[in-house]
């Protein structure tokens, strides 16, 4: 009995250690991002990890502590590169990447995408209140805010003729940040449309439309997708030296590139 309790306590301790979040770099710019000054990085890969073949693995940055060490262990102990998509587009998306791709002479796909909400969604500027100081959207999720939620917000705002009190502002902004709501009219907020999410992530318009894919599934697939401009940055060496740039981007979590 004592041995079983001791074993359960040890297993619980291990789980608690693994559940501890990892410490992420700030700013989260990896080995360099467009328009951000950074030193020249050099890294030494383990001999077994030197390509070709080349590998690339992406996962959420805020994974439990044990996850990244486990992934690294199975991929030749290569350390992850952490990048936030807010340096590439108007939405934040903290991701980690374990890869053995070349990091020298990387370049972004041009033209650079819009980097602020106003640039990406210019029609929202007319209705954007001064007390909503967001310039970036939060991470794209697999679901969106409901019509009931936006209706509750509208009613809360319509109780006030001018600027609402701080308590109402806080309530509205908390929901805006949680669900990536944008202003589409006086006191009217709405979730992003699927084609707007596609644009923010770097996909062509209607990339997820049709073919039996429902609106809900479009949001889900985009929420689980990657940011194309970051993906292109990592592959830019090969796009420049080996392959021509293509509009077709293969959506994979892991791929091996033999060249």
Name what the model sees in each region.
Residues 1-259:
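Conserved active-site and SAM-binding loop architecture
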């Amino acid at each position: 009995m004592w041995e079983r309790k001791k074993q359960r306590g040890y297993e619980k301790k291990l789980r608690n250690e693994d559940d501890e979040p990892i410490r992420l770099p700030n700013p989260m710019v990896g080995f360099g991002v467009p328009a951000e000054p950074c030193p020249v990085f050099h890294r030494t890969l383990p001999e077994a990890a030197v390509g070709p073949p080349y590998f690339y693995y992406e996962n959420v940055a805020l994974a439990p502590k044990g996850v990244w060490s486990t992934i690294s262990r199975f991929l030749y102990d290569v350390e992850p590169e952490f990048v936030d998509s807010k340096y590439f587009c108007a939405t934040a998306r903290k991701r980690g990447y374990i890869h053995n791709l070349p990091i020298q002479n990387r370049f972004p796909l041009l033209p650079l995408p819009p980097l602020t909400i106003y640039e990406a969604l210019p029609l929202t500027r007319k209705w954007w209140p001064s007390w909503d100081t967001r310039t970036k959207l939060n991470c794209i999720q697999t679901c969106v805010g409901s019509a009931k939620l936006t209706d509750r917000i509208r009613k809360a705002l319509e109780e006030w003729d001018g600027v609402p009190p701080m308590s109402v502002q806080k309530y509205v902004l908390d929901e805006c940040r949680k669900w990536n709501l944008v202003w589409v009219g006086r006191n009217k907020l709405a979730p992003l449309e699927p084609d707007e999410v596609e644009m923010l992530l770097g996909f062509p318009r209607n990339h997820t439309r049709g073919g039996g894919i429902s609106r809900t599934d479009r949001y889900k697939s985009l929420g689980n997708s990657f940011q194309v401009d970051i993906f292109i940055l990592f592959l830019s060496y090969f796009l420049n030296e080996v392959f021509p740039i293509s509009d077709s981007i293969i959506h994979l979590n892991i791929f091996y590139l033999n060249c």
